[in-house]
Amino acid sequence: MSKMIGAPTRYRQGKDELKCLGDDLKDYKRIVVITSENLKEMFIPQIEESLHEQEMTVVLFQNECSMSEIERVQHIVEETNSEVIVGVGGGKVLDTTKACGYYAKKPIVVIPTAASTDAPCSSLSVIYHDDHTFDHYLYLPKSPDQVIVDTQVIANAPVRLLRAGIGDAFSTYFEAKACYVSHSENCLHSQVTRSAFAISKADRKSVV
């Protein structure tokens, strides 16, 4: 069996990265930004300032990553003739962003607001019904085109979310090791690469 690693096309991390968003997206004229109501006032003004040369449409997430929500956002993307979809928020916002990018055939940029989710880098969206019960996994052909992590945003998130992210980073090493030594199949239907295992080691080392 072959070995394969999946990763975003570009990963960028640093303090005040939201201020650089205009440079990251300078090749696009029309942009849709998906975020939640509780994050709108916190982040949209910064993003609007950074994207002042672009035409931006803000879409407020309606509480669930469901097919009806994905279709609603996709319709807005198509109606505004937007060229790229940006997701700002937690796991469900980012999963919705990834699914919309897939169905609308548009590049996506994800900006996580907490360390407690794997959604930013994965090639997977977890889809629910509108009543919040599980529907299905949507396996995507690739990870996001860009992941932008503003460390100031992550640091300002609720402490419980940072703790959860640290715990997840710590446990990833043991999960990766079990898969690596047993030659188990990963979500890409291949075996774990040495580089992926090395990243999991670095994750553990950074939080110990």
Indicate residue ranges for each PLM-predicted region.
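ATP/NTP phosphate-donor binding region
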Residues: M1-V84
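Alpha-helical scaffold segments in soluble metabolic enzymes
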Residues: C20-D24, Q46, R72, A99, ...
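Short glycine/serine/threonine-rich phosphate/pyrophosphate-binding segments
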Residues: K40-I44, K92-K98, T117-C121
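A short, small-residue-rich loop immediately preceding and capping a beta-strand
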Residues: V77-A115
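A glycine/threonine-rich phosphate-anchoring loop and its flanking beta-alpha core
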Residues: A104-A202
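Conserved small/polar residues in nucleotide/adenosyl-binding loops
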Residues: K205-V208
